Amino acid sequence: MVAVRSAHINKAGEFDPKKWIASLGISSQQSCERLAETWAYCLQQTQGHPDADLLLWRGVEMVEILSTLSMDIDTLRAALLFPLADANVVSEDVLRESVGKSIVTLIHGVRDMAAIRQLNATHNDSVSSEQVDNVRRMLLAMVDDFRCVVIKLAERIAHLREVKEAPEDERVLAAKECTNIYAPLANRLGIGQLKWELEDYCFRYLHPAEYKRIAKLLHERRLDREHYIEEFVGHLRAEMKNEGVQAEVYGRPKTYL
């Protein structure tokens, strides 16, 4: 299940950008300052917009997802700005003047990937595995920068979170698209962390009864299991180091699939 993030909330229950940026684990002070400037720019551009809160929230979610993958600061800034560009709150030309060409190039690459919706058959069940694989290959061929694909995966996860309370047909449509295209794409790229979260949400939306049944059988919450694994991995690493064994040790909780 999805980890609950609260590091960016202050005592009054309000969003605290300084606290949020500090929680992302960005080592460079300059990078933190640039992200703070980008956040301020997003606030300015969305002022008075009816969907301001939603667009800002979506960008925050995407940045948090990408920060767990230790993506560079340009990727994080592009992710924060992407919802605004995608909703045409601010044009790419204006962004190019404000934040630079490199970030706009990333945003443009992510937006180009939306064209794939015209090629996949998530509205029905007639799509073949060969067609789906062709779509995935096309996605990879459409972008010149790997970071665009990773941002798109983060955007799809944010979307799946967003439609949690939406009508069933909207949830199912989003889940089918991610099941057919984006979860396998994350797997092909070796980004297991994003693949597991995509699959968790898709299973929840496509098979709600089974999801609830399995969830009920799991006595440990995912966060508890993650904490247990972290402790176990730490202990195992220490023991292996004491024995002079050089090895990489890692673990993860199983998903519901």
Enumerate the language-model features and the residues they cover.
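Active-site helical microenvironments for divalent-metal-assisted chemistry
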Residues: 1-257
